[in-house]
From Swiss-Prot:
Keyword Cytoplasm appears in the UniProt entry: no
Matches recorded under HAMAP family: NqrA
One matching Pfam family: NQRA_N
Assembly notes: Composed of six subunits; NqrA, NqrB, NqrC, NqrD, NqrE and NqrF.
Gene: nqrA
GO molecular function: oxidoreductase activity, acting on NAD(P)H, quinone or similar compound as acceptor
One Gene Ontology biological process: sodium ion transport
Protein name as catalogued: Na(+)-translocating NADH-quinone reductase subunit A
């Protein structure tokens, strides 16, 4: 067991009950183009085209062979683009049940398949896009290989679902997915989990590792840091546990598995719980009658690093396993810093609330102040459990110092790894976008 001591479990109200329920009926789903780092689409469909489940919607011209397929059958009703023609979303109105089918296999046949057969079916079905590289967090090239695949079979994000509850409902598919990954890498598959019992693969190159401690103990970046540190010469791949299940279902049934179980939770949710829905589901549909009255912000993903779900982005993200809802914090408070703060949370124990352990807080979207200077008071070191000089690295991100940031470990990180640093920052800096700019520059300059 690897025990993480640094970090923070955010005491936010609206914790979900760990029981799976059916979600609202979904009328629209979408693929969100901006989720795929560096992707340049070649469109295969137009508005009004009728598509089957599993049909190619667009391909990546910068990553030849990688295709993105429809998670449902229906009609393409929107293709949304932003500044510089960046693809924002391809929206499908759900209709019918037609689908593209693929080869199916018995569970005991999977480990005897060759790597090329597995890779081809994953690529053709669009399931390949569930994999992400580290460094850079991109969909891997179809001719690339890795010596390490990390399965994130736990989730320590605030308000997250318990991975064990979901995996134990799909034991056969999860093991099948692990067997496929064991062939895909030929080297090691690291299944990273919290304490508890999960179905296990019998393949010798599939290893289980237990992580314990506060968030970010459940992030792939943390697991890689301790088990297989990455750089440009040591590339690892990561995949979420629900995508491992989808891999298994694809090969066991020959059909694309689009079901996604998400945590619908937060202080502004009427009945926080786990709900069954579809990959890319409309969050307008999913949250209908689920949120409290008033102005709220719906977030696809975690409150620490998710994306605001509004307009052309109002859909469940490809890599997200939760939907969080917060009240918009627009109220101004006179001399808020001077009150005891019994109902306010502070990492630095600035408020009276730190005397009441176990208290959950109705947090909002407010930043509690305007932008200001970055102040190194030890907050970053308190929540970043990686062997890095946190303050120095974050300072380099602010300054855009590519060389120094790379030396200090920026290549090991993804935006989600800095979510807590953003949360505890007294200067209100958003470190995720700064990190992405640095990573893009490093990749561009080779």
């Amino acid at each position: 067991m690897i025990t993480i001591k640094k970090g923070l479990d955010l005491p936010i109200a609206g914790v979900p009950t760990q029981v799976i329920n059916d979600g609202k009926s979904i009328t629209k789903v979408a693929l969100l183009g901006e989720e795929y780092v560096g992707m340049r689409p070649t469109m295969h469909v137009r508005v009004e085209d009728v598509v089957k489940k599993g049909q190619v919607l667009f391909a990546d011209k910068k990553n030849p062979g990688v295709v993105f397929t429809a998670p449902v059958s229906g009609k393409v009703v929107e293709i949304n683009r932003g500044a510089k023609r960046v693809l924002q979303s391809v929206v499908i109105a759900v209709e019918g049940e037609e689908q593209v089918t693929f080869n199916s296999y018995a569970a005991n046949e999977l480990v005897s398949l060759d790597r090329e057969t597995i890779k081809t079916q994953l690529v053709d079905s669009g399931a390949w896009t569930a994999l992400r590289t580290r460094p850079f967090s991109k969909v891997p090239a179809i001719d690339s290989e890795t010596k390490a695949i990390f399965v994130t079979a736990m989730d320590t994000n605030p308000l997250a679902a318990d991975a064990e509850v979901i995996i134990n409902q799909q034991e056969e598919a999860f093991v099948a997915g692990l067997d496929l990954l064991s062939v895909l890498t030929g080297d090691k598959v690291y299944v990273c989990k919290k304490g508890g019992s999960l179905p296990r693969s019998s393949q010798k190159n599939v290893e289980e590792h237990v992580f314990d401690g506060p968030h970010p103990a459940g992030l792939a970046g943390t697991h890689m840091h301790y088990l297989y540190p990455v750089d440009t010469n040591h590339v690892a791949w990561s995949i979420g546990y629900q995508d491992v299940i989808a891999f298994g279902q694809l090969f066991l049934t020959g059909e694309i598995y689009s079901e996604r179980i998400v945590s619908l939770a937060g202080p502004a949710v009427n009945n926080p719980r786990l709900v069954r829905t579809i990959t890319g589901a409309s969050l307008v549909d999913l949250t209908d009658s689920e949120v409290m009255p008033g102005e709220v912000r719906v977030i696809s993903g975690s409150v620490l690093n998710g994306t605001q779900a509004a307009g052309p982005h109002a859909y469940l993200g490809r890599y997200h396993q939760q939907v969080s809802v917060l009240r918009e914090g627009r109220e101004k408070e006179l001399f808020g810093w001077a009150v005891p703060g019994k109902n306010k949370f502070s990492v630095t124990r600035s408020f009276l609330s730190h005397l009441f352990s176990g208290q959950l807080f109705n947090m909002t979207t407010t930043t509690n102040g305007s932008d200001r200077a970055m102040v190194p008071i030890g907050n970053y070191e308190r929540v970043l459990p990686l062997d890095m000089e946190a303050t120095m690295l974050l300072r380099d991100l602010c300054a855009g110092d590519v060389d120094s940031a790379q030396r200090l470990g920026a290549l090991e990180l993804d935006e989600e790894d800095l979510g807590l640093c953003t949360y505890v920052c007294p200067g209100k800096y958003e470190y995720g976008p700064m990190l992405r700019e640095i990573l893009d520059t490093i990749e561009k300059e080779g």
